[in-house]
Amino acid sequence: SRAGVIASLEPIINTLKNESKKGKPIFGICTGAQILVESGLVPGTSDDQTSVALADNKRIKSGEVVGTGYYNAWSNLKLSVPQNSTAFTRHLSENEMINIPFAHAEGRFIIPDDLLEEMKTNDQTVFRYCDYNGKVSSEFPTNPNGSDYNLAAISNASGCLLYTSPSPRDNRV
C-alpha cells in the first residue's frame, strides 16, 4: 500500500480539515506530505478525494531510467508562484531559489494533466526542482525523483496547506 494511506484515515485528519478551512497553516513534509495527499487535503479538490499520488522515485536521464527508490542529496527548488500565494512563501522573493536536503524513496508527484493545469492556474505548483542557475529541467539530477512538472511542493487553493517531498527538516544549518 502507498505510504500515508493508513494515517490518512485517523481521526486527527478531520481536525486538520477543519483547521485548514479556518485558514490555519499546515506544512506536510515527506511522510506528512503523503498523509495530506492520501487524505485529499492537498491539492484540495471539492470532494476531498485523493487526486495526486506520491510514487516511487524514478531518476531519468536522456529518456532512460538510471535509478529508482531511495535517493539522498541536496536539491535546488525554485519558487514558481507569487510569494504571497501561500502562508509559507510570503517572505521569499519572486523566483527565489532554495537549496534543501532530499532524502526519500516515494516522493515523485503524479498528477493528471487536467488537474495540473488547474493547479498552475490557481498558483498551487509552489516549488519546482531546478539547477544551480534556476533552470527547470526534467533530467536527473535536476529532477531527482521524476516528478511531473518537476514539482517539489504543492499547496491547496487557499495556500494554507503546503506539502513537500524534500525534507527541510533535515537541514542542519
Regions found by a protein language model. Give the residues of each.
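Cell-surface, membrane-associated systems
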Residues: 155-157, 162-165
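Catalytic beta-strand/loop cores that center a nucleophilic Ser/Cys/Thr
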Residues: 71, 78-157
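General alpha-helical segment detector with a strong preference for membrane-spanning helices
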Residues: 34-35, 108, 171
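Single conserved hydrophobic/aromatic residue that forms the stacking wall/gate
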Residues: 163-166, 170-173
